[in-house]
């Protein structure tokens, strides 16, 4: 998670929930996310399961299990392709952007749709919604972290947040 609970519940405009079922695993947080959605925050659920919060989601991307990294790289591709990266943040606070952009260039929405079993247009819509929001935390949990590609999954979520300058926002 890239933000405090207060940031998520009181400030978020978009919440990107990846591989996490907070209503079951963290009920207080789940309730607070539900309240944030009720106050107008947009919700993107990325989970193969029909978790409770999926019914409140603006977009539900039901990835094939094990495809979190491809999903995140596809989001990054769409963000870069649309010119939505936070150039100032990337230039001043990150390194290796050029190499990263080359790496995600192969993760077109169509390719990611095939890998993940999702709709390419939904991926682009999610990337756009996430990138354009001023305050959009990523909340991930065991569905990302406790996987054979967990380290890469967590790094991919961090890369996505840094790409749009949303660490702490």
Specify the residue positions occupied by each region the protein language model found:
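Cofactor-pocket helix-loop regions in the catalytic cores of large enzyme subunits
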Residues: 1-169
């Amino acid at each position: 998670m890239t933000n405090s609970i207060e940031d998520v519940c009181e400030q978020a405009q978009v919440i990107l929930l990846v591989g996490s079922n907070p209503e079951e695993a963290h009920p207080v947080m789940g309730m607070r996310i539900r309240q944030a959605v009720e106050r107008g925050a947009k919700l993107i659920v990325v989970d193969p399961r029909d978790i409770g919060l999926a019914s409140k989601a603006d977009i539900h991307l039901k990835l094939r299990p094990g495809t979190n990294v491809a999903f995140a790289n596809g989001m990054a591709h769409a963000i870069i392709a649309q010119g939505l990266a936070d150039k100032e943040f990337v230039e001043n606070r990150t390194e290796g952007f050029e190499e990263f952009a080359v790496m995600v260039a192969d993760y077109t929405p169509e390719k990611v749709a095939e890998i993940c079993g999702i709709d390419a247009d939904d991926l682009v819509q999610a990337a756009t919604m996430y990138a354009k929001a001023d305050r959009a935390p990523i909340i991930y949990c065991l569905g990302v972290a406790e996987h054979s590609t967990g380290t890469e999954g967590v790094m991919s979520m961090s890369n996505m947040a840094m790409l749009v300058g949303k660490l702490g926002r």
